Curated annotation (Swiss-Prot):
Tissue localization of expression: Expressed in panicles and flowers.
Protein name in UniProt: Expansin-A10
Induction entry: By gibberellin (GA3) and wounding.
Top-level taxonomy: Eukaryota, Viridiplantae, Streptophyta, Embryophyta, Tracheophyta
Xref: CDD domains: DPBB_EXPA_N
Function: May cause loosening and extension of plant cell walls by disrupting non-covalent bonding between cellulose microfibrils and matrix glucans. No enzymatic activity has been found. May be required for rapid internodal elongation in deepwater rice during submergence.
Domain Expansin-like EG45: 50-163
SUPFAM superfamilies the record matches: Barwin-like endoglucanases, PHL pollen allergen
Organism for this UniProt entry: Oryza sativa subsp. japonica (Rice)
Any single GO BP term: plant-type cell wall loosening
Leader sequence segment: 1-18
The keyword rRNA processing is annotated on this UniProt entry: no
Subcellular location, record wording: Secreted, Cell wall; Membrane
Length: 257
C-alpha cells in the first residue's frame, strides 16, 4: 500500500458489504465520470471508532465497509462528508475486475504527506484526486496486488434506509447536532435550526457533519432545515420533541429523489 495517512480511524463492521448495501447504493448520477486514483488499507472490523466526518460508529449509521477517505482536493474541509461516489477501475487489464463498480460514502479524510512529492508517494497531496478504500471495497473492483490503481468516479445519489438522523449533544448554551443517514446528494452544506422561542437560525459547521450553535434550546421542540450540495432543501418540523435530551438521536423525514 502506498504511504497515506488517515486523520483518524474508521470503524468497519464485519457484516457490511460493498455497493450492494441498500443504504449506500446510488440511484442516479449527479456528475460526469472523472479520473482519479485509489489505494487501500487493511481494515479491521475491530478498529477504534473514528472518522474525520464525525459519524463515529459507521455500522450504526448505515455506512459499513462502503466508505472512503478523500484527499484534500475532494474533502473540502469536511463539506463533502456524506456524499456518495460510484467508483470503477480503469486502464489496467491485469488488475481491474471488468464490469464492476462500487458506491461508497465519504466518511473520512486521507491526509496529505508533504514529506513526499504528490507524484511519488504523497498520493493524497494536493492537487491529487485520491480515494482511500478499505481493502474489502477495493477488492470489489480490482485485485489487491494493484496497489495504487487508476479509477474513474462520479457523484451519485445516495439511497438510505429510513429518515435523516439528528444526534443531539452539547450542554446548556452550546448545542451540537450530528446529521447522518442523508439521502439524495448526501452532503449537507447548510443547516438552520428553529425552536418555539426563535425564528430560523443558521448553524455553523463544527467539523464534518457535526453542526453547532451557541443558544439554549432546552425545553423547546426543534426543527431543522437542511440544504444539500445539489441545492435541494429538506425541512423537518419538530423532529426533536420538547422533552429532548443531550445524547439522544431523533429520526425525521428523508430527501426525496
Amino acid at each position: 500500500m502506498a504511504p497515506c495517512l488517515l486523520l483518524v480511524l474508521f470503524l468497519l463492521p464485519a457484516l457490511a458489504t460493498g455497493h450492494q448495501h441498500p443504504s449506500t447504493l446510488g440511484s442516479s448520477a449527479l456528475s460526469e465520470w472523472r479520473s482519479a486514483k485509489a489505494s487501500y488499507y487493511a481494515a479491521d472490523p475491530e478498529d477504534a471508532i473514528g472518522g474525520a466526518c464525525g459519524f463515529g460508529d459507521l455500522g450504526k449509521h448505515g455506512y459499513g465497509m462502503a466508505t472512503v477517505g478523500l484527499s484534500t482536493a475532494l474533502f473540502e474541509r469536511g463539506a463533502a462528508c456524506g456524499g456518495c461516489y460510484e467508483v470503477k477501475c480503469v486502464d489496467d487489464l491485469k488488475y481491474c475486475l471488468p464490469g464492476t463498480s462500487i458506491v461508497v460514502t465519504a466518511t473520512n479524510f486521507c491526509a496529505p504527506n508533504f514529506g513526499l512529492p504528490a507524484d511519488a508517494g504523497g498520493v493524497c497531496n494536493p492537487p491529487n484526486h485520491h480515494f482511500l478504500l478499505p481493502i474489502q471495497s477495493f477488492e470489489k473492483i480490482a485485485l489487491w496486488k494493484a496497489g495504487v490503481m487508476p479509477i474513474q468516479y462520479r457523484r451519485v445519489n445516495c439511497l438510505r434506509d429510513g429518515g435523516v438522523r439528528f444526534a443531539v449533544a452539547g450542554r446548556s448554551f452550546f448545542l451540537t447536532v450530528l446529521i447522518s443517514n442523508v439521502g439524495g446528494a448526501g452532503d449537507v452544506r447548510s443547516v438552520k435550526i428553529k425552536g418555539t422561542e426563535s425564528g430560523w437560525l443558521s448553524m455553523g459547521r463544527n467539523w464534518g457533519q457535526i453542526w453547532h450553535i451557541n443558544s439554549d434550546f432546552r425545553g423547546q421542540p426543534l426543527s431543522f432545515e437542511l440544504t444539500s450540495s445539489d441545492g435541494k432543501t429538506l425541512t423537518n418540523y419538530n423532529v426533536v420533541p420538547k422533552e429532548w435530551d443531550f445524547g439522544k438521536t431523533y429520526t425525521g423525514k428523508q430527501f426525496l429523489l
